[in-house]
């Protein structure tokens, strides 16, 4: 019904383009989490800003509706694995960008040992070799829910699903070499 809504940017750019401290901090995060470009980082920073902004507004608000929204925000962040189960609204204000970047599918695939490097994890996801909860996800920036974390595997249709795949054997060998 009607026209589709206007597409809007999902991120805010920094207010000043050449602040050295911010550029250095962004470069470290880009390298550590193997992000494609700054826009990916800015999207997650904007998401974090929005969570924190909502928390500040809800801390000041009173009433039934504010209480409902508090519970909804906390439930969402707990479902995403960003907050522990016993968290309160003040804990939202202490979230960092690293907390969100740790919940990306790309990071979790690497940490679970399904890929040798962050870059390989990104490639496996984009090429459709990774599935979450039986669904192939092709977005490395997908934020994995806490209950989905255990369901991340190689896709059934992927050659990587075969334990005898040469690349998979190299990943296993690298895992054993790291443990020894």
Swiss-Prot record:
CDD domains given in the database record = S4
**SMART domains reported for this sequence:** Ribosomal_S4, S4
UniProt record, GO biological process: ribosomal small subunit biogenesis; translation
User: Which Gene3D superfamilies does this entry report, sorted A to Z?
Assistant: RNA-binding S4 domain
The superkingdom of the source organism is: Archaea
Keyword RNA-binding attached:
yes
Output the InterPro entries linked to this UniProt entry. Ribosomal_uS4 (IPR022801), Ribosomal_uS4_arc (IPR022802), Ribosomal_uS4_CS (IPR018079), Ribosomal_uS4_euk/arc (IPR005710), Ribosomal_uS4_N (IPR001912), S4_RNA-bd (IPR002942), S4_RNA-bd_sf (IPR036986)
PANTHER family annotated for this entry?
30S 40S RIBOSOMAL PROTEIN, 40S RIBOSOMAL PROTEIN S9
Q: List the HAMAP family hit by this protein, alphabetically.
A: Ribosomal_uS4_A (MF_01306_A)
Mind telling me what this protein is named?
Small ribosomal subunit protein uS4
Q: Which organism is it from?
A: Pyrococcus abyssi (strain GE5 / Orsay)
Query: What would be the name of the gene that encodes this protein?
Result: rps4
